């Protein structure tokens, strides 16, 4: 599929706002879009969906096999999409410790031209050195346009354009400084899209700014250029947790990867959704229940009082139904959760651990997992860990994974499993290797 990537020299350059504005502007022009977020981030994809009206897939070149990324790209083409719009993560060449898994790697894999968003707030002629360095750093990654962001005045814009003119990299537009074009944040990143009361107005405003200040015809020329190679379409996927999987989905359980659901459906699984915050129970015929990550620490009191949800999960576990929790879902499977104010809330009590958001410590990074039983995955896995909550008490139980970091350093064992119930702080993304 033809498309392009919005990337930047560093985080905080404005690429998310630019991506959202372009998605909405292209949607208004009638383009059929395939939004993509590079890396493991859960929050930006919900904004992409709001802007485009289409589900956004995470494509992670560190955690996913190249074949899976190519297959997911092909799947988007099969669904009728015509333009893939990818938002990079961090800086264009930033990845794991060795630099692998960067946005540049994804652009190379999918043959996407890169549009570089540069924060110009505190520079003028120095931008030429920055853009030149980025354009020359990897010859297999093509930077085919620049968007100047946070430009202070027409004079500032003229200086920037003059500095870049000798490089031959097209300047697609210059966006003025505008504090209104920023999104609210919290501890794991942006506030979730569903909680942004003025999101629709923000997206329309961002699209108006893109239409007014970016040469959309020049951008189209970039994404319509001939591709150098085609992606492969078929690849093995992670086995589903069951045949009929009930997935918790609401503001407390919002962090789930679309590619997992798509892959499970392709392998014949049925997926249904329920809201613990609305005190809903999973479907009675579900043979697997998935509690993904999210923000249970912000909704602990409501979860503690959700009697129908609590009873249904407990009954399902007693019947031997697979119950699997990741990160926030893992915390909810434990005995208690201490919120930021130090209040302890009873959780499901299906795993012998107590967690705290009051005693915060950042845990962040890619992980290599060796399953130790309890799940349908018996091959090495790649995952991501990102949370502030800590385990304050943990009783003896079987472990779920043996863990290494991205550089291969042994981090010991993690997660718990009791009967058919299991969980950990790891967000599983893909398996490692080519055999399912």
Swiss-Prot record:
Pathway: Cofactor biosynthesis; adenosylcobalamin biosynthesis; cob(II)yrinate a,c-diamide from precorrin-2 (aerobic route): step 9/10. The active site is at residue 327. It comes from the Bacteria. Residues 244-435 form the GATase cobBQ-type domain. Its EC number is 6.3.5.9. InterPro entries: CbiA/CobB_synth (IPR004484), Class_I_gatase-like (IPR029062), CobQ/CobB/MinD/ParA_Nub-bd_dom (IPR002586), GATase_3 (IPR011698), P-loop_NTPase (IPR027417). GO terms for biological process: cobalamin biosynthetic process. PROSITE patterns: GATASE_COBBQ. SUPFAM superfamilies: Class I glutamine amidotransferase-like, P-loop containing nucleoside triphosphate hydrolases. Its cofactor is Mg(2+). GO terms for molecular function: ATP binding; cobyrinic acid a,c-diamide synthase activity; hydrogenobyrinic acid a,c-diamide synthase (glutamine-hydrolysing) activity. The a and c carboxylates of hydrogenobyrinate are activated for nucleophilic attack via formation of a phosphorylated intermediate by ATP. CobB catalyzes first the amidation of the c-carboxylate, and then that of the a-carboxylate. Belongs to the CobB/CbiA family. NCBIfam families: cobB, PRK01077.1. PANTHER family: COBYRINATE A,C-DIAMIDE SYNTHASE. Catalyzes the ATP-dependent amidation of the two carboxylate groups at positions a and c of hydrogenobyrinate, using either L-glutamine or ammonia as the nitrogen source. This is Hydrogenobyrinate a,c-diamide synthase. It comes from Brucella suis biovar 1 (strain 1330).
